[in-house]
Regions:
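Metal-dependent nucleotidyltransferase catalytic core
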Residues: 1-27
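Conserved nucleotidyltransferase catalytic core and NTase-mimicking acidic/glycine-rich helix/loop elements
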Residues: 38-171
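Short conserved active-site loop signatures built around small residues
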Residues: 31
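General structural signal for secondary-structure boundaries
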Residues: 2-6, 16, 34, 118, ...
């Protein structure tokens, strides 16, 4: 998918599930492998598309929130169809990924957008750029500090259990 399609098709008829998924994964969990300046420029262009000059100080980055919600709905519907009876995809591992890992990604996006309240559009863009550059878990730690520890310890326990070959076999 060309980069301009990720930016210019948000919410339009041509904004397919594939484009939405790639755009949101880029925003919510992207790590650069090379050419950081180009990645950064595209990242900032994408954020500017979500937060225009018309966004008020009192609001949050609502357009981004709506797209994050749409992305989560998309993967939830995809999960349902891919795990119906007769499909080859395994139900339990997919469900666990959706319930925990994808919700972490989703919540991390919503929290980043919520943190933009009180800023003008320039400040909102800067706050999103700062927070969305962080991995979702680090993002939650940054926003919530020590209040996030208990939940993140439980999440760590879940991930360690999910990586246990014996448990995975039983799933």
């Amino acid at each position: 998918v060309p980069a301009e399609e990720l930016v210019n098709r948000i919410g339009l008829d041509g904004d397919t599930n594939s484009i939405t998924t790639r755009r949101l994964l880029f925003l919510l969990e992207c790590e650069w492998l090379y050419n950081e300046p180009a990645k950064r420029a595209f990242f900032d262009e994408l954020i500017a598309n979500y937060v225009t000059e018309n966004v008020t100080r009192d609001s949050i980055a609502r357009f981004l929130v709506n797209d994050v919600i749409r992305y989560y709905r998309t993967i939830s519907v995809d999960f349902e169809i891919k795990t119906r009876e007769g499909r080859a995809k395994a139900w339990a591992p997919r469900r666990l990924k959706l319930v925990f890992s994808r919700k972490m990604l989703y919540f991390g996006g919503i929290i980043a957008a919520a943190e933009t309240a009180g800023f003008d559009y320039v400040g909102k863009r800067a706050k999103l750029s700062e927070l969305l550059q962080l991995p979702p878990i680090t993002r939650l730690q940054t926003v919530f500090g020590d209040k996030s520890l208990a939940a993140l310890e439980l999440y760590d326990h879940f991930l360690s259990r999910l990586n246990d070959p014996e448990i995975r076999q039983r799933l």
